[in-house]
Amino acid sequence: MYKKLVFIFIAALMGACTSRQQADEKTLYISILPLRSLVGEIVGDDFKIEVLVPPGASPETFEPTPRQFIGLNRAEMIFNVGLIDFETTLLSKIEERGKVVNLSQGIELIAGSCSHAHTPAKQAAAGGDDTSCAEPHNHSHAHGVDPHVWTSPRALQKMAQNAYAAIRRAYPDSAKYETNYKRLQADLRALDARTGEKIAQSGIEYFIIYHPALTYYARDYGIRQVAIEADGKEPSAKRLTQVIRQARED
């Protein structure tokens, strides 16, 4: 009996220590998975990075767990695209609004189609003007803003700049973050140049994609995106025929 009590006491003590360590651990929250590596390249292993929307889940139907909501309020910083509905709804409830970082700030935004549940243009990041989609079959009337800014290496450079600016404000004495950021920007600039060069050499004028997720990529590199999907619905036989005919003719 004595040995059993000692074992229970030690187990409880270890559990308390683990809980204390978890509470003391500095955590950053990221809204969607594509942003994780961007922020991680700057901060390295100094923070635990939590992603809100798990792999395979849809941001359009995502709802945070109670544990995630508690974690958000305890987080050092929260990085988000700033253009997806769940971000606007969820992050407006965060007590410390100053720790929420909008990574799309300053990017020239593109009007989205109604195939997405996106933040309306009037609620989108300041500093970006809506433009028509780079894809000819996309509706340009008011259905919000296309949020897929991270698909363009050119836009990623601005997102990295926004992330670093926020991190530097919070941790001005860390020279390591500046070094990491400069290395990241050099890599992104090289990727941008290489992408533009390869596309120019290929002579590609457009590409066909099921879901219109590469609008910023198409815009930034002077090509057109032809989406098979229309307004979030499966394509009709007529639409499929149009796309096939266009591909054959070109």
Question: Residue spans of the language-model regions?
Answer:
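Sec-dependent signal peptide recognition
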Residues: 2-8
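Generic N-terminal leader/processing signal
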Residues: 1-2, 18
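Extracytoplasmic metal-acquisition and chelation regions
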Residues: 17-250
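Hydrophobic h-region of N-terminal signal peptides that target proteins for export
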Residues: 10-18
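Intrinsically disordered, low-complexity segments enriched in polar/charged small residues
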Residues: 8-9, 123
